[in-house]
A protein has these predicted regions:
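Buried hydrophobic-core signal for structured, non-transmembrane domains
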Residues: 37-43, 87, 102-106, 158-163
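Short acidic, flexible loop segments centered on an aromatic residue
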Residues: 44-62, 165-173
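Beta-sheet-dominated interaction scaffolds and their linkers
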Residues: 19-40, 141-154
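Intrinsically disordered, low-complexity Pro/Gly/Ser/Thr-rich segments with frequent PxxP/GP/PP motifs
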Residues: 62-94
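N-terminal signal peptide c-region/cleavage motif recognized by signal peptidases
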Residues: 13-16
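Terminal connector regions
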Residues: 92-138
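Intrinsically disordered, low-complexity segments enriched in serine, threonine, and glycine
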Residues: 148, 153-173
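Positively charged n-region of N-terminal signal peptides that target proteins for export
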Residues: 1-4
């Protein structure tokens, strides 16, 4: 009997949660013909935030994350201010016949004011978005142009897709 009340309480309390630092996209496609790519970050909080950003690999088979440099890796973003995170190629070789994918992590760390004898719980929100490097050899190609290379199949109650194209594909309804 108490589980429905817990679920209702959780739903009501979640409406008050918000991220202070908002990233300006769900993915960043790095054009191989350019030297860098930029994504915006905005502080929607009433206090300053420290913004920390870094790259991580998608899986063990991913190219090394040191193929890029994030600048600035750590900076202060005042209340209501917009900033930019720039991703720059380091010169390390990446495959030029297919896309490479990494995770771009952008964490907003809110400022706190020390108040003696008061307990405070505070969360730092980490936004994890896709960084897709599209080599110069694939410039102008779109996922739609490679749709016929997808192999669709059925396994019991699920649908499987094998991607034989050099591009990463995203699906939505």
């Amino acid at each position: 009997m108490r589980y429905p009340f817990f679920a209702i309480g959780l739903l009501l309390s979640s409406s008050f949660a918000q991220a202070s630092v908002v990233v300006g996209g769900t993915r960043l496609v790095f054009d191989g013909t350019k030297n860098n790519a930029v994504i915006t970050v905005e502080n929607k909080d009433q206090n300053s935030n420290i913004v920390q950003s870094w790259l991580s690999v998608v899986d063990a088979a991913s190219p090394a994350k040191d193929a890029f440099i994030i600048t600035p890796p750590l900076f202060r973003l005042k209340a209501g201010e917009k900033g930019f995170v720039r991703v720059v190629r380091s010169g390390k070789k990446l495959p030029d016949d297919r896309e490479s994918m990494f995770w771009l992590n952008i964490k907003g760390i809110p400022a706190t004011e020390y108040v003696p004898d008061k307990n405070v719980v505070q969360f730092a929100i980490n936004s994890k978005i896709k960084l897709i490097y599209r080599p110069a050899a694939l410039k102008g190609n779109t996922p739609e142009s490679y749709a016929e290379k997808l192999q669709w199949g059925k396994e019991r109650t699920s649908v499987t897709v094998k991607n034989n194209s050099p591009l990463y594909m995203n699906f939505s309804q």
